[in-house]
Amino acid sequence: GSPIMADDPQEAEDIVSICSALVLNMGTPCERTFRSMLAAGKEANKRGKPVIFDPVGAGASAFRNELAATLLREVSLSVIKGNISEISFLTEGSGTTSGVDAHREALSTENNLNEHVRLAQRLSEKTGAVVAISGPIDIIADSREAWAVRNGHPAMAALSGTGCMSAAVIGCHAGANPQAPLLSCVCGMSGMGICGELAHER
């Protein structure tokens, strides 16, 4: 993919018109980006383009919570990708978000894998989106099917921004395969994990 970033409402619709997919990232929200994301999301829906939502920090502030709730309500999302804290908040209205990182004790492991799959599937049923939960084991699920992706390296957790990169990679796959959001998510998350493995080796 060839990326472009925009956050002004005046160009949101124009930028969406030339993109294959839209990634909405809640990393640095403000009133302007709130309006931009809403306008861009609605335009992408109108044009039938996949929308990937990365609810960075959902649950950390009332403003972020309002933005996330508005996007869930007013935009048809193809993919929601977040850490376990963010996905828990979107699903249940509660969580342990205190920054962009998930709390270590909440991360997906073999012991809680089924519980986290059910959480992802509940949010998928609620929104119609494929849900990806990033962590030591990445979980990708829709309401009928779930995948566990075990690629990656623990060092990736120490690098801020890898989650945002993953959302962009998913966007590239979804833009090329707009009718296959689940497969796009699996390819994006596993590909990002493989990149982390190779980077650590080098």
Predicted ranges, named:
Residues G1-R47, F53:
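Active-site cofactor/substrate anionic-group-binding motifs, chiefly glycine-
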Residues S2-I4, S20-V23, K49-I52, L77-I80, ...:
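Structural motif
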Residues P29-R32, G57-S61, I139, M156:
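Short, small-residue-enriched loops and turns at beta-alpha junctions
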Residues T33-G82:
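Glycine/small-residue-rich loop that forms an oxyanion/phosphate-binding "nest" at active or ligand-binding sites
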Residues R64-A146:
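Conserved phosphate/ATP/ADP-binding segment of small-molecule kinases
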Residues F89, L159-G191:
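Short, small-residue alpha-helix embedded
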Residues V149-G161:
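Short pre-catalytic strand/loop immediately N-terminal to key active-site residues, enriched for Gly-Thr
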Residues I194-R202:
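Charged C-terminal helix
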